[in-house]
Amino acid sequence: MKNLLLILIGAVLVNNFVLARFLGLCPFLGVSRKVETALGMGMAVTFVMVVASGCTWVLQYLVLTPYHLDYLQTIAFILVIATLVQMVEMIVRKSSPVLYQSLGIFLPLITTNCAVLGLAVLNIQQGYSFVQSLVFAFGGAVGFTLALVLFAGLRERLRLCPVPAAFRGTPIELITAGLLALAFMGFAGLVPG
């Protein structure tokens, strides 16, 4: 149980996919204009990450490894992730058309979100069990959502601030993202090793 808690805390705070591993930067910069949109994207990515983690773990250890098909890992994982994203897209379109509209192109782009594929590959590289991989996926997704929502909140506040002309737009947003990443570095001592 302690091991699972360390995996969870490590994935959320210490090894945050966006702020420490620099995975998933496209949606981080593209969807984080409003907190509501960021939260919706975070929930969609959370669902995809957790389910993809379970599916790719099963695929790896029941199909790819036993039949010595490890060289197909990347393409097989992408196919699983693409299928899940299509399912999420259909669900969001039916249940929340406003959220679907606000996410725009970024919802289908979850398929190519390197955080989702990176998570699946990291699960295998770390040698996690099925339960550990699900906990790692949930922690990674919560960390992704946390970074997305925090950055969206900061961007909303920045719109109200008098920013010098040279820093308006992307420059101040990248500086803010860097400061947020520095803040998350403060969690580095939480998880040993």
From Swiss-Prot:
InterPro entries: Ion_transpt_RnfA/RsxA, NqrDE/RnfAE, NqrDE/RnfAE_oxidrdctase. Signal peptide: none annotated. GO terms for cellular component: plasma membrane. It is a multi-pass membrane protein. It holds the Pfam family Rnf-Nqr. The complex is composed of six subunits: RnfA, RnfB, RnfC, RnfD, RnfE and RnfG. NCBIfam families: PRK05151.1 (NF003481), rnfA (TIGR01943). Part of a membrane-bound complex that couples electron transfer with translocation of ions across the membrane. Belongs to the NqrDE/RnfAE family. This is Ion-translocating oxidoreductase complex subunit A. The lineage of its organism: Bacteria, Pseudomonadati, Thermodesulfobacteriota, Desulfuromonadia, Desulfuromonadales.
